[in-house]
């Protein structure tokens, strides 16, 4: 980006609000709803119930209004994932980094989703949630277990977070807001 583009983008950010849409998917119990609650309410809510179908929340962070689609992770709702991922600015795939027995199932669910032609080129953010728990996998291990280096044709990023303790939520939001100007399909 050259100097003049930077100045133009700065003035745009002052006068025009940006909107972005994100879809959060992942296996049940991975922490999708907790993450949405932390982003929208600024803190952890103890009694989070599993999402049946989907929930949507709008949140404003700075000059960006974010529409967050939280889709249920139970097997019966996974067929809905593609529909809610079409045309979004980014897909957020949430993984319980402490539940190692489900890594292979998470990998398969992720591959099934991102291999859908309508979702080509949509940026993917993988969040390895629950890093506050013992034996949780770090970023490098998550990248390896989910074969994230094998994903081509889209930007892919992975962060280790704790939605419960608000660890790395800021860098996660920064990455997502950076992609708010991504072209929607």
Curated annotation (Swiss-Prot):
One of its GO terms (biological process) is protein transport. SMART domains: ARF (SM00177), RAB (SM00175), RAS (SM00173), SAR (SM00178). Keywords: GTP-binding, Nucleotide-binding. SUPFAM superfamilies: P-loop containing nucleoside triphosphate hydrolases (SSF52540). GO terms for cellular component: lysosomal membrane. It holds the Pfam family Arf. It comes from the Eukaryota. The keyword GTP-binding applies. CDD domains: Arl10_like. Gene3D superfamilies: P-loop containing nucleotide triphosphate hydrolases. GTP binds at residues 28-34, 70-74, 129-132. Coiled coil: none annotated. Belongs to the small GTPase superfamily. Arf family. NCBIfam families: small_GTP. This is ADP-ribosylation factor-like protein 8. It comes from Dictyostelium discoideum (Social amoeba).
